[in-house]
Regions:
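N-terminal targeting signals for export/organelle localization
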Residues: 1-5, 102
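Structural microenvironment flanking redox-active thiols in thiol-disulfide oxidoreductases
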Residues: 61-68
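Conserved helix-turn-beta segment immediately C-terminal to the redox Cys motif
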Residues: 21-23, 38-59
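Conserved Rossmann-like nucleotide-binding pocket used by diverse enzymes
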Residues: 4, 29, 55-57
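Short pre-active-site segment immediately N-terminal to redox-active cysteine/selenocysteine motifs
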Residues: 21-22, 29-32, 75
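A short beta-strand-turn-helix
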Residues: 5-24, 65
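Non-catalytic, surface beta->alpha helical segment in thiol-disulfide oxidoreductase systems
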Residues: 75, 81-108
């Protein structure tokens, strides 16, 4: 069994993402968003495939408006890759596994 996908909140985002020692992929999503639900299995895949190189988590945007607004997330799903407390890459909109793999490989 691979690494689990974490759930981040406004309260935990700084300590678990911005201060993390590894690169972190965050999926900004909402339960009412159909394309977001399609991305969920790919977050599990990324957590398992890139275990040791990448931490993966998600942030539900409606319940965590501070983090959503700080990073100016306008549409969902939005994937943001963080390293050393900074955004290094962003992908807006749902993508297929080959595109997710290319996105991650380009930045890891």
């Amino acid at each position: 069994m691979g690494q689990a996908v974490s759930d981040y909140t406004d309260a935990t985002f700084a300590s678990e993402v911005l201060q993390a020692s590894t690169t972190v992929l965050v999926d900004f999503w909402a339960p009412w968003c159909g394309p977001c639900r399609l991305m969920a299995p790919m977050m599990d895949w990324a957590a398992e495939t890139y275990a040791g190189k990448l931490s993966v988590g998600k942030l539900e945007v409606d319940g965590n408006p501070q983090t959503r607004d700080f990073f100016q997330v306008q549409g969902i799903p939005t994937l943001i890759l963080f390293r050393d407390g900074k955004e290094v890459a962003r992908q807006e909109g749902a993508i297929a596994k080959p595109q997710l793999q290319a996105f991650l490989d380009a930045h890891l």
